Amino acid sequence: MKNIVLGGGCFWCVEAVFERLKGVIDTEVGYSGGNPNPSYESVCNGDGNIEVVKINYDEKQISLLEILTLFFKIHDPTSIDKQGGDIGIQYRSIIFYENEEDKILAQNFIEEQQKIFSKKIVTKISRLQTYYKAENYHQHYFINNPNQGYCQAVIAPKLQKIQSG
């Protein structure tokens, strides 16, 4: 089993996509990259943390390359601290890696993707230093709240787009 931690906008959206993938064992939403012991309120007030999803996966069933490819399909890696209507540093595009092999793979992936994108990719790559699990009510938010307004307006269409190819 391996882990990768990704930030690409609202963590509810990112988690909703990855928790459905074959080979993904578990997902957990949290915060990384800012002040210690964050809360949702402190993150929204700009404490420097990023909304992230920790993805625990079986590399025999799904590769990191496949995960990163999907990650770039579900968010805009050329947008600085903004995804759709969600604006702020907590929504930045970032890949937090745990080992050098994953760092190199992520760097090579972004280099290849830059050949496809007309705008500059701004996704950061950084070693995971600290990770804080988000509050329980954020975990598996779409599964637990499929009829909530944000879920219907933002997450459900994103899932439909991914499922339709």
UniProtKB/Swiss-Prot annotation:
Protein name: Peptide methionine sulfoxide reductase MsrA
HAMAP family: MsrA (MF_01401)
Provenance organism: Campylobacter jejuni subsp. jejuni serotype O:6 (strain 81116 / NCTC 11828)
Segments traversing the membrane: none
Pfam families per UniProt: PMSR
InterPro entries, per the entry: Met_Sox_Rdtase_MsrA_dom (IPR002569), Met_Sox_Rdtase_MsrA_sf (IPR036509)
Active site positions: 10
The protein's role, per its UniProt record: Has an important function as a repair enzyme for proteins that have been inactivated by oxidation. Catalyzes the reversible oxidation-reduction of methionine sulfoxide in proteins to methionine.
